[in-house]
Amino acid sequence: GCGEVEVHLGDARNLNFINDESIDLICTHPPYSNIIKYSENIPGDLSHCDIKDFYKEMEKVSSECYRVLKKNKFCAILIGDTRKKGHMVPIGFNIMDIFLKTGFKLKEIVIKEQHNCSSTGYWRNQSIKYNFLLIAHEYLLIFKK
């Protein structure tokens, strides 16, 4: 049969309207730290955080996800990496570490091809010349509680 569906507008850092261990599946694609702006003036918008604050806020998300997810159920997060000032920032791996420290177990990493990526001309040319890949993917991190 069909069950009832409830929709709430909220923030994944505070899911106080959801009971402990009551959710079967969590799927999220959080706003990346200072990469794509999702709003202009929404307080607490993670897309406006610097990287260190973004990680701190994602610790709150991880804790709330762990609290509301039923045992032996799954949490899936789509997240990618970036470059800042010419250096690679492994956001995906750092988020994976945050969720592991919360208590989740990593079940799977799925690599999703990402289109419309930008890269510096030098590295793009080098990648073509030597047949290697640049950041052109995101990670679908699948955790189990």
State what each model feature region is.
Residues 1-145:
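Class I S-adenosyl-L-methionine-dependent methyltransferase catalytic core
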